[in-house]
């Protein structure tokens, strides 16, 4: 199989539904990246994971922010149709220094506006997870979800 082009497909999955071995693999990798563990043995011991499980999953699991570095992230927001809500969303994106590529907003119906925003995260000062969390905390943002990235 050497020489064959292997395209990998990725999914965005809530970590709540992942098996424990995959979660612990991600934790062990994070310990190694942050320098909190010096060796793989130390990392897997700290998270109570077998080395074989670590090696099985290490190339297929990584945090959302790592998968989305230098990417375009598209998310859908459900906003209350109140003055200033969209402005607060855009100001939050600007604070994170994400580059807004597109904004699509439907006509508000029954006090709710659906907005789709695509951002380029190459110059961001923080990880995309924290941007999404900050957007979700804005008064008037009822729902936010990632609908794509490339």
From Swiss-Prot:
InterPro entries: ACT-like_dom_sf, ACT_dom, UPF0735_ACT_dom-cont. This is UPF0735 ACT domain-containing protein DSY2247. Coiled coil: none annotated. Residues 74-149 form the ACT domain. NCBIfam families: PRK04435.1. Signal peptide: none annotated. It comes from Desulfitobacterium hafniense (strain Y51). Belongs to the UPF0735 family.
């Amino acid at each position: 199989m050497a020489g064959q082009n292997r395209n990998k497909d990725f999914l965005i999955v809530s970590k709540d539904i992942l098996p424990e071995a995959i979660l612990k693999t991600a934790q062990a990798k994070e310990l190694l990246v942050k320098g909190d563990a010096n060796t793989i043995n130390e990392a897997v011991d700290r998270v109570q994971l077998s080395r074989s499980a670590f090696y099985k999953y290490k190339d297929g699991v990584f945090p959302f922010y790592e998968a989305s570095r230098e990417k375009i992230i598209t998310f859908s927001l459900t906003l209350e149709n109140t003055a200033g809500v969209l402005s607060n969303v855009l100001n939050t994106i600007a604070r994170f220094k994400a580059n807004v590529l597109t904004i699509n907003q439907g006509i508000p119906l029954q006090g709710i506006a659906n907005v789709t925003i695509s951002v380029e995260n190459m110059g961001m000062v923080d990880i995309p997870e924290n941007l999404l969390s900050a957007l979700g905390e804005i008064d008037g943002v009822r729902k936010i979800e990632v609908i794509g990235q490339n």
